[in-house]
UniProtKB/Swiss-Prot annotation:
SS bond partners: C99-C109, C123-C143
UniProt entry tagged with the keyword Transcription: no
Gene Ontology molecular function, alphabetical: cysteine-type endopeptidase inhibitor activity
Lineage: Eukaryota, Metazoa, Chordata, Craniata, Vertebrata
Domain of life of the native organism: Eukaryota
Residues annotated as signal peptide: 1-26
Matches recorded under SMART domains: CY
Family statement drawn from the similarity comment of this UniProt entry: Belongs to the cystatin family.
An example Gene Ontology CC term for this record: cytoplasm
Name of the protein in question: Cystatin-C
Short motif (Secondary area of contact): ranges: 81-85
Amino acid sequence: MAGPLRAPLLLLAILAVALALSPAAGASPGRTPRLLGGPMDASVEEEGVRRALDFAVSEYNKASNDMYHSRALQVVRARKQIVAGVNYFLDVEMGRTTCTKNQPNLDNCPFHEQPHLKRKAFCSFQIYSVPWQGIMTLSKSTCQDA
């Protein structure tokens, strides 16, 4: 009688161990488990995120026909994904500055306050970086007026 029960009990034990070790087992209620290799939240203070943001803003300004530079007003969300390099996903509120494009230093440019010159945009940037090879590319960029 012990023989016929052994196989189902063994399968049940294997299933219990597999469930206990699955990524979903450690997830908090109401939160989806983080996938290995999937995007994860990143801090704007991280050096890689800062470099990706600077690169995205530079590319945004190169592609813009505006006579004024724009810069980040606020980083709404920053995520990163480790692949053969790093994908950065940045949601950024951009603002038009008082500096024209022939002025090189964008860091200290104030934002326009005059209503007819003030302009904001909400942008989502995807930047691919391979830091050890010095590679950084803007994979995707979408913006809409805010």
